[in-house]
From Swiss-Prot:
Ribonucleoprotein listed as a keyword: yes
Protein name stated in the entry: Large ribosomal subunit protein bL36
GO terms under biological process: translation
Gene that this polypeptide is encoded by: rpmJ
Organism, as annotated: Pseudoalteromonas translucida (strain TAC 125)
Family matches, as Pfam families: Ribosomal_L36 (PF00444)
Top-level taxonomic group: Bacteria
One Gene Ontology cellular component: ribonucleoprotein complex
Family recorded in the similarity comment: Belongs to the bacterial ribosomal protein bL36 family.
InterPro entries: Ribosomal_bL36, Ribosomal_bL36_sp, Ribosomal_L36_bact
Length: 44
C-alpha cells in the first residue's frame, strides 16, 4: 500500500474508488487489487 499526501492521481486510475474507513481515506482498485493507497498517515 502506498502512502500519499494527495489521492488525486490514484483515484483517477481505471476501476479505482475512494473509501473512508476509521477516519482515513483509502483508494482501492477492483481491476488491479495490488494497487492500494491511503492518504497521509501519522508517523509514530
Amino acid at each position: 500500500m502506498k502512502v500519499l499526501s494527495s489521492l488525486k492521481s490514484a483515484k483517477q486510475r481505471a476501476g479505482c474508488q475512494v473509501v473512508k474507513r476509521k477516519g482515513r481515506v483509502f483508494v482501492i482498485c477492483k481491476e488491479n487489487p495490488r494497487f492500494k493507497a491511503v492518504q497521509g498517515m501519522k508517523k509514530k
